[in-house]
Swiss-Prot record:
Gene for this chain: oxct1
Function field: Key enzyme for ketone body catabolism. Transfers the CoA moiety from succinate to acetoacetate. Formation of the enzyme-CoA intermediate proceeds via an unstable anhydride species formed between the carboxylate groups of the enzyme and substrate.
Places the protein is found: Mitochondrion
Self-association and partners: Homodimer.
NCBIfam families according to UniProt: pcaI_scoA_fam, pcaJ_scoB_fam
Catalytic activity of the protein: a 3-oxo acid + succinyl-CoA = a 3-oxoacyl-CoA + succinate
InterPro entries, A to Z: 3-oxoacid_CoA-transf_A (IPR012792), 3-oxoacid_CoA-transf_B (IPR012791), 3-oxoacid_CoA-transferase (IPR014388), CoA_trans_fam_I (IPR004165), CoA_transf_AS (IPR004164), CoA_transf_BS (IPR004163), NagB/RpiA_transferase-like (IPR037171)
Disulfide bonds: none
Family to which this protein belongs: Belongs to the 3-oxoacid CoA-transferase family.
Active site residues of this protein: 335 (5-glutamyl coenzyme a thioester intermediate)
Pfam families named among the record's database cross-references: CoA_trans (PF01144)
Protein's UniProt name: Probable succinyl-CoA:3-ketoacid coenzyme A transferase, mitochondrial
Source species: Dictyostelium discoideum (Social amoeba)
């Protein structure tokens, strides 16, 4: 008779069934060091997380301690200088990064521009889908994201610079094959798989089933499916059966190793909380720059219509949600995996596992839902988001947008903007009318690498509002105190003037 502490095995027509057990699973490792010690030089690692939210911090530190080198690391972000993947960059164990947005890591930017690091930037939604496809055995897929851009379709974007300071490009991105479907062009993207995946979950059972907490889910599920060996760092391990089957986020078939982390720093990149209402802010006069931004944002808020699903970009676009008109109800979608984003939390109620796409702490609302980055971009790519509001560096007269890179000096990455601009949702770009040097930002042709081609529907600045109609600009609103000739002097692109030209509209406060 079998011991009560062992699994009871029942054989029925060549199918093995296991009853409950208190025995130790062979997937559970004593510590992170043991779980990663066999990772060899030159491995390809898939690392979960979004910013610093949901990163496998103990596994990353353990990889650093092994001294393994020449790694190719696939991750949405590159951490910060002294935390997350930043520690592997600092120790120079990474040869190539495949990422979407790396704007928070100065070490990353410096190594890339000096030719010390290979960097393959990819749109965030493409990254999520390439991983999902890799885990599903799909070698490649077609997408409209990146059509008409040097980063995706055209190729030629620098992957590696020479390390002699010359600025010469040694490795460039390859152009993508294209195909027309129903008259629309699509690019072929290859899937991504890895040797090892390092992911972070909230809870695991002894069979490897995983549960994530809030937006710490993000890229972890697609990463988990796409590797030969997936190592999950968790906060709690429970016996099989304690996680109900319909509560499992990632089934144990994808997980080979489990480690319970001894502690978690869970650093927050942007702790953002509600400001106390004292009345002082209303009485304090705004400086000119703040007044410009508020004027832009208050006009942008008039784009909201009742019942809309909206995605707001980082910076000024996010502020538009502070001015939603009375009687209008919208749901905010955040590409890191949240639908129904609430306001910033009160001080002391913030949660490191609950952030928005700008890495700011947020809350949920009744009816919110949380999902993986792959599901998030399926919503976006599928055209289920009604309105996208983005910032811009340049917009052309035919609606091209550039907002993600200044070659040779600023490397942020495209993030989710390329996916959002190609999704078929209405795209509104908000920005100041000119640069800080007074040069136009609305141009005949963008001079910076494009985010999207012919994708902008409306441009809102502190001076004017333009619609893009059949590939041409039409001026529809002008701020009081400015004439059409004033706008022409500050706008390089040609435009027509609406017969119903109005003053610049503002939402009521």
């Amino acid at each position: 008779m079998l011991s009560r502490n062992l699994k009871t095995l029942v054989k029925n027509k060549n199918i093995l069934y296991f009853t409950t057990s208190t025995s130790k699973s062979n997937k559970i490792y004593e510590n992170a060091k043991e779980a990663v010690k066999d990772i060899p030089n030159g491995s390809k690692l898939l690392v979960g997380g979004f910013g610093l939210c949901g990163i496998p911090e103990n596994l990353i530190s353990a990889v650093r301690d092994t001294g393994v080198k020449d790694l190719t690391v696939v991750s949405n972000n590159a951490g910060v200088d002294d935390f997350g993947l930043g520690v592997l960059l600092k120790s120079r164990q990474i040869k190539r990064m495949i990422s979407s947005y790396v704007g928070e890591n100065a070490t990353f930017e410096s190594q890339y521009l000096k030719g010390e690091l290979e960097v393959e930037l990819t749109p965030q939604g493409n990254l999520a889908e390439r991983l999902r496809a890799g885990g599903a055995g799909i070698p490649a897929f077609y997408t409209s994201t990146g059509v008409g851009t040097v980063l995706v379709e055209e190729g030629g974007f620098p992957i590696k610079y020479a390390n002699d300071g010359s600025g010469k490009v040694e490795i460039k991105s390859e152009p993508r094959p294209t195909q027309l479907y129903n008259g629309r062009k699509y690019c072929l993207e290859e899937s991504i798989t890895g040797d090892y995946a390092l992911i972070k979950a909230w809870k695991a059972d002894t069979r490897g089933n995983l549960v994530f907490r809030n937006t710490a889910r993000n890229f972890n599920p697609p990463m988990a499916t796409a590797a030969k060996i997936t190592i999950a760092e968790v906060e709690e391990i429970v016996d099989a059966g304690e996680i109900k089957p319909d509560e499992v986020h990632v089934p144990g078939i994808y997980i080979q190793r489990i480690v319970k982390g001894p502690s978690f720093e869970k650093r927050i990149e942007r702790l953002t909380v509600q400001k106390e209402k004292t009345g002082e802010a209303a009485a304090k006069p705004k400086d000119e720059a703040a007044a410009k931004r508020e004027r832009i944002v208050r006009r942008a808020a008039l784009e909201f219509e009742d019942g809309m699903y909206c995605n707001l970009g980082i910076g000024m676009p996010t502020l538009a949600s502070n001015f939603i008109p009375k009687g209008i109800r919208i749901e905010l979608q955040s590409e890191n995996g949240l639908l129904g984003m609430g306001p910033f939390p009160k001080m002391g109620e913030h949660d490191a596992d609950l952030i928005n796409a700008g890495k700011e702490t947020v809350t949920t609302i009744p009816g919110s839902s949380i999902f993986s980055s792959a599901d998030s971009f399926a919503m976006i790519r599928g055209g289920h988001v009604d309105l996208t509001i983005l910032g811009g560096m340049q917009v052309s007269g035919n609606g091209d947008l550039a907002n993600w890179v200044i070659p040779g000096s600023m490397v942020k990455g495209p993030g989710g903007a390329m996916d959002l601009t190609s999704s078929g949702s209405r795209v509104v770009v908000i920005m100041e009318h000119t640069t800080k040097h007074g040069k136009p930002k609305i141009l005949k042709n963008c001079t910076l690498p494009l985010t999207g081609k012919s994708c902008v529907n409306r441009i809102i600045t502190e001076l004017a509002v333009f619609d893009v109609v059949n590939g041409k600009l039409e001026l529809i609103e002008v701020v009081d105190g400015q004439t059409v000739d004033d706008i022409k002097s500050k706008t390089e692109a040609e435009f027509t003037v609406s017969k119903n030209l109005k003053p610049l509209q503002q939402v009521e406060i």
